[in-house]
From Swiss-Prot:
The N-terminus is blocked. This is Trypanothione synthetase. InterPro entries: CHAP_dom, Gsp_Synthetase/Amidase, GSPS_pre-ATP-grasp-like_dom, Papain-like_cys_pep_sf, PreATP-grasp_dom_sf. The record marks R328 as: Transition state stabilizer. Conjugates glutathione (gamma-Glu-Cys-Gly) and glutathionylspermidine to form trypanothione (N(1),N(8)-bis(glutathionyl)spermidine), which is involved in maintaining intracellular thiol redox and in defense against oxidants. Its EC number is 6.3.1.9. Its cofactor is Mg(2+). It comes from the Eukaryota. The gene is TRS. Mg(2+) 2 binds at E344, N346. The lineage of its organism: Eukaryota, Discoba, Euglenozoa, Kinetoplastea, Metakinetoplastina. ATP binds at R328, F329, D330, K513, K548, G555, Q583, I618, I619, T620. Residues 34-174 form the Peptidase C51 domain.
Length: 652
């Protein structure tokens, strides 16, 4: 039963400009594009007239384009936006000669100037700082044009105004738009001697030495490391999620239940990490696009073998719940061809999320890998998991519904902690014996709290099977009473259609491999997409193929056949009677006898991190060990705050 006054929930908040659309134009007709929200990172490079401007659509990307188009100058590479304040020079776009710049501290006798770059410091909530352009200066305000700070449509040639205070001869810019997060920018950077380029002028002729140089090909390498010292008891047994992990697997990131003397992990470069982000972000959009095509097309939807009786409910979930928490891509990479391909999207899964977001980093610290010039690949997971919960539309209590397996329970507890961190109330529910029906026939928990939000590890397919079994047992005229026992289907497919589910029912579509041929035919030229068909074609026979059930988990009932017709691997399981799809065979690189599958996490609508499942078999399964990924970095950037600038001034 659906409520007539139900309001749809969505990540697309009213007034927020979608990613990539123009928010407005700064003076000089320089566009600013929406980055969607603060924690979204596309991983896509922005190239303007052969200049690398940054990543779409971060604040530095706008600053570089603004400086090039407004002044004919090129901003050198910086790690973070705040580091622009420490620059001594930029370059002339035409000559590549160095051009001195002047950084002016905020809170001095100098009044801000228009056509300069305003720089924000590092903070607890934003380590990288921020940069924008000052477009206008009044006696008590400055106007700012920027990206990735506020996401509305501009009403003029700037995004917002900031307060400018003049007191005791000192000029101070104050960002108090959010009274709960007042910020004082570091200052602004000026470009003496460089006038603004004429409105509508052709792009400056760029010196060849400033042209963008493509990066080296990415790599992913399995490594063996012998720690010089190790930290015992590196997981917190007072943390419920970590305690359950230890009970199940011990102190071992690989979950192999073995003590480690030498350790194995995977190292990738920054380019590999960026490719995971870019492909994951793009593919998520493609799967959402294909879901929209399927859900209201009866002919296509029949291919997915979802019972037609449940279509109205699934369509209701698509219409009214456009929020979600987690999904994981399965990527494969070949170090010789430097190709990365997507095998599938586990859009209704949270398995190995704790391992990716917390365990692999704590393990790396316990064996000293955090001191080896690398960074964890799951650093954004916990932040983005909290953001997903904060924006998902749930209020009050969330029931975390799991089986009696410890792996499901620690995964649930990890997600529960993130929900509670943003003000929700979480309750772990192992099985469903504690639930009952109230007098109105709605499900309540042991505290009498009506179920309004459910996070679950149960497959929707399990609930559907139970739904039809219950129909057969209860009969057509059955109505729930407090004396009746609550079943799985009563929680997931009961009378209340307005319960928020994580993941929602419509994720039956993107998590079904029947979507893969649609994805391929929609975007056949995308470098990460493999050919996929509903029937075995001559093209697939020629290159080899994987035969997969449209509904299945953990690598069950998969057959891999090469281009000669020889079967290289096959797995058993309980999905063999399902319809099949045929996917182009992709050659994985075998390292130290192992094949690696990269799990790429979407949390909410943002790509958030990676982890690896490896196996000596080319088909990874439920028991395949987890392996950590470390991202090689040249140096760890340091924050820049007002105190840092004060100390630098003292040292000088």
């Amino acid at each position: 039963m659906a409520s007539a006054e139900r309001v749809p929930v969505s990540f697309n908040k009213p007034g927020r400009v979608p990613f990539g659309e123009v928010q407005g134009y700064a003076p000089g007709h320089i566009p600013a594009y929406s980055n969607k929200h603060d924690h979204f990172f596309s991983g896509e490079r922005s190239i303007d007239d052969n200049v690398f401007c940054g990543f779409k659509y971060q604040c530095v990307e706008f600053a570089r384009r603004w400086l090039l188009e407004r002044k004919g100058l090129v901003l050198p590479d910086v790690n973070w936006a705040c580091h622009i304040f420490k620059l001594k020079n930029v370059k002339d776009a035409a000559t590549a000669e160095e051009v001195p710049v002047i950084a002016v501290r905020n809170g001095t006798e100098a009044k801000p100037e228009p056509d300069t770059l305003i720089i924000y410091p590092s903070s607890d909530v934003n380590t990288v700082g921020h940069v924008g352009a000052i477009t206008e200066v009044g006696d008590d305000y400055v106007c700012i044009a920027d990206q990735n700070y506020r996401f509305h449509k501009w009403e003029a040639s700037y995004s917002y105004k900031l307060k400018l205070q003049h007191k005791d001869g000192v000029w101070t810019i104050i960002d108090d738009i959010d009274p709960n997060d007042v910020e004082i920018p570091l200052g602004w950077v000026t470009f003496p001697g460089y006038e603004n380029r004429p409105e509508g002028a052709a792009p400056p002729a760029l010196h060849p030495s400033l042209h963008f140089q493509p990066p080296e090909e990415p790599y992913l390498v399995r490594k063996t490391y012998e720690p010089t010292e190790t930290k015992a008891n590196w997981l917190d047994l007072n943390d419920p999620a970590e305690k359950l992990f230890v009970e199940e697997f011990g102190m071992d990131v690989s979950r192999s239940r073995l003590e480690e003397t030498t350790v194995n992990y995977y190292e990738c470069d920054h380019e590999f990490h960026l490719r995971c982000i870019a492909y994951g972000t793009q593919l998520h959009d493609y799967f959402m696009e294909a879901t929209a095509q399927v859900i209201n097309d009866d002919e296509r939807l029949r291919i997915f073998k979802i019972p037609e009786e449940l279509w109205p409910r699934m369509r209701h979930s698509w219409k009214y719940q456009q929020t979600y928490i987690s999904g994981r891509f399965d990527f494969a990479y070949n170090n010789e061809t430097h190709q990365m391909k997507c095998f599938e999207y586990n859009a209704d899964s949270a398995s190995t999320l704790l391992e990716c977001g917390r365990i692999q980093q704590k393990w790396a610290e316990s064996v000293g890998l955090d001191k080896e010039g690398t960074r964890g690949s799951g650093w954004a997971v916990e932040r983005n998991l909290r953001t997903a919960w904060a924006t998902c539309g749930a209020t009050g209590r969330v029931h975390f519904l799991v089986d009696d397996e410890k792996e499901e329970q620690y995964t649930a507890l990890y997600c529960l902690q993130a929900a509670e961190a943003v003000g929700l109330e979480g309750k772990l529910c192992v099985m469903y014996d504690e639930f009952r029906f109230n007098e109105e026939g709605y499900v309540v928990d042991s505290d009498g709290v009506r179920v309004r939000n459910i996070w679950k590890t149960w497959m929707w397919e399990s609930a559907i099977s139970d739904y039809f079994a219950a129909q057969a047992e209860r009969g057509a005229d059955w109505k729930a009473t407090p004396a009746d026992k609550v079943r799985l289907c009563d929680l997931m497919l009961g009378k209340d259609w307005d319960i928020l589910y994580f993941e929602p029912m419509w994720k039956l579509i993107p998590s079904n491999k029947a979507i893969l041929p649609i994805i391929y035919h929609n975007h056949p030229d995308h470098p990460a997409i493999l050919r996929a068909e509903y029937e075995l074609t001559d093209e697939l026979r020629a290159v080899g193929y994987a035969r997969k059930p449209i509904v299945g988990r953990v690598g069950r009932n998969v057959t891999i056949t090469d281009g000669t017709g020889e079967v290289h691997a096959e797995s058993g399981g309980n999905f063999g009677e399902r319809d099949m799809i045929y996917q182009e065979l992709f050659s994985l690189t075998k390292q130290d006898g192992y094949y690696a599958i990269i799990g790429g996490w979407m949390l909410g609508d943002a790509f958030s991190g990676t982890g690896i499942r490896e196996d000596k078999s080319i088909i990874t399964g439920l028991d395949s060990p987890f392996a950590a990924i470390r991202i090689k970095i040249n140096a760890i950037p340091r924050p820049l705050t007002h105190k840092d600038l004060d100390k630098l001034a003292e040292d000088e």
